[in-house]
Design a protein with these regions (language model features):
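ATP-dependent carboxylate/acyl-activation modules
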Residues: 1-180
Length: 180
């Protein structure tokens, strides 16, 4: 919402991924945009017609999914194809023109990280760290993200103080009934 993610999930199927994303912040996703990285199937489409959503974006939609989604009034369904999900450039308006530049999509070499504390990260903690790093780069201003290995748990963003962003993220986790 407002250029910040309010949910994200990974699952064994699209519906499970969607359910995890929604459970991150069941209030804020109302009226939002939902994006997928693979074809939307009929089971997922049935879930998508329940809430009020502005837009659904995916590489493709099954014929049955499209028939289901067409029944929802004022819903924009955008099929971008697999290449459409590649995000290589950003455009920003500035005084007197626009700034068109290559986006910073570098992931870093996480496998080369060195733990400098006495406690080594467990595999699940390292996976949570990787997901958190991927997500936080999409959150604006004093971004705080809590994640586990397959779900965004809470977001704090847009505050003058990082401490306030942390408080918001912790509150969001608590309100969603999730655990840090």
């Amino acid at each position: 919402k407002h250029a910040n993610p309010c949910g994200f999930g990974i699952g064994i199927n699209l519906k499970e991924s969607y359910d995890r994303a929604v459970s991150t912040d069941p209030v804020s996703y109302f009226g939002g945009i939902v994006g997928f990285n693979r074809e939307v199937d009929a089971d997922t489409a049935l879930e998508l017609i329940q809430p009020f959503l502005e837009c659904i974006i995916a590489p493709s939609f099954s014929e049955t999914a499209l028939e289901i989604l067409k029944k929802k009034k004022n819903l924009r369904v955008i099929s971008v194809g697999k290449e459409g999900l590649q995000d290589h450039y950003s455009i920003k308006s500035i005084a007197g023109g626009y700034l068109y530049q290559q986006k910073d999509n570098q992931q870093g070499e996480l496998e080369k990280l060195e733990t400098v504390t006495h406690t080594k990260l467990k595999q699940s903690e390292f996976q949570a760290l990787q997901l958190g790093w991927k997500l936080v780069r999409n959150v604006k201003s004093n971004a705080i993200v809590f994640a586990n290995s397959d779900q965004l748990l809470g977001v704090g963003a847009g505050q003058m103080s990082r401490i306030d962003s942390v408080k918001i993220a912790v509150r969001k986790v608590s309100e969603a009934g999730l655990n840090l």
